[in-house]
Amino acid sequence: MSNVVVMGAQWGDEGKGKIVDLLTRKCDVIVRFQGGNNAGHTVLVGDKQYILHLIPSGILHPGKKCLIGNGVVLDPAVFCREVETLRDKDVDVSPARLMISRKAHVIMPYHKALDVARECHKTNESKIGTTGRGIGPCYEDKMSRIGIRAADLAMPELLRAKIEAALLEKNALLAGLYGGETMTVDAVFDEVMAVAPRVVPHLADVTAEIEAAWAAGQHVMFEGAQGTHLDIDHGTYPFVTSSNTVSGNASAGSGIAPTRLDRIVAIVKAYTTRVGAGPFPTEQLNEAGDYLQQKGHEFGATTGRKRRCGWLDAVVLREAVRLNGPTDIALTKLDVLSGLKELKICTAYEYQGGTITVAPQEQNGMAHVTPVYETMPGWDDDITGCTTWESLPAPTRAYIARIEELTGVRVSLVSVGPERDQTINRGW
């Protein structure tokens, strides 16, 4: 397997965890390149379920090296909890296989406090549905060049000085603007230093580790979080995350040249879901939406929030293709559609008196489109036991073929269930 980027093509929750876990078998190093613990990957291995928020799911494969890149924002306490949980399940999480870029920025207690305070002070119409994990405020400090990086955890004097400088501003915001409680330098410093000794042994030069892997002839996978349409620049702004989720950030977020990337896999759920606020043209607030939500067990791995559900949106997918340039599609949760008499695919939008096939770029423009649907026959068959393309029902194959026609990208992997082996490989 060549060097590959795996990214979500919708609004996150596409099933990246399973596909990453599957493809990990053919690679040696897995790199997480953006986001923080505001995303969750769920992987089912035998009778054990693993939910990972920071650590790449490749850690579940013995002998694979997992790297957290400079584009990630790291909550050290969450990292330590995940390490402990995995260790309790006999997973090797030693620093030799799990490394963190020294350049990764650290989520501080005041970031989380600000995240929650801001959301609480917004009107219902302006709330973006933040997870309250401090992701956005941490990225803000990074861009303002006042952030704390992972390397600082090994330098207590520098860390304390940075905390002291940061709290001059953060306390003014927390107390003066939001009416909240202030934080002391000692309390923040002590909270971070309580976990720092467990994080510091994992610090490394991630770029050098990747280069060393390539020099040894090894294959590297770059694992994205969230989805294309939550991208800070290209998503449904302002209802987006705080990082670039598109494939191009695999390079910047891990410190490698884009010319080293060979394949890009877009993970596409067979229908569409979204968590939290924001436009969702194909959302179904009816029996079809309830069916997808209940059969698909659509609850967020990170927040536990019920996901909004709707029909597949090919306009959204074409935009994802344009932004990411995928070489392959991995189609997930196809089995959830079994039992529906008919399926709908949105192929265009009605917008401002005309028909468009590209998403509008005006702020909240997606909230004012009307989907144009194409209807296809569904199927009653249970496809969870299908292992080949030929064993799938004819309507299922037609649905997949239509996705390929609408996106111009081959569906190379088809997931028909949550288990690792419930995947049809069409020439990956």
UniProtKB/Swiss-Prot annotation:
Q: Which GO terms describe its cellular component?
A: cytoplasm
Leading EC class: ligase
Q: Where is the active site?
A: D13 (proton acceptor), H41 (proton donor)
Q: Which CDD domains match?
A: AdSS
Keyword Glycoprotein on entry: no
Among the GO molecular function terms of this UniProt record, one is: magnesium ion binding
Tell me the pathway. Answer: Purine metabolism; AMP biosynthesis via de novo pathway; AMP from IMP: step 1/2
Keyword Iron in the entry? The reply is no
Q: What is its EC number?
A: 6.3.4.4
Q: Quote the record's binding site residues for substrate.
A: A301, T302, T303, G304, R305, K306, R307
Q: Where does IMP bind?
A: D13, E14, G15, K16, N38, A39, G40, H41, T131, R145, Q226, T241, R305
Compartmental location: Cytoplasm
Q: State the free-text cofactor note.
A: Binds 1 Mg(2+) ion per subunit.
Q: Which InterPro entries match?
A: Adenylosuccin_syn_GTP-bd, Adenylosuccin_syn_Lys_AS, Adenylosuccinate_synth_dom1, Adenylosuccinate_synth_dom2, Adenylosuccinate_synth_dom3, Adenylosuccinate_synthetase, P-loop_NTPase
The role this protein plays is: Plays an important role in the de novo pathway of purine nucleotide biosynthesis. Catalyzes the first committed step in the biosynthesis of AMP from IMP.
Instruction: Identify this protein by name.
Output: Adenylosuccinate synthetase
Species, as recorded: Nitratidesulfovibrio vulgaris (strain DSM 19637 / Miyazaki F) (Desulfovibrio vulgaris)
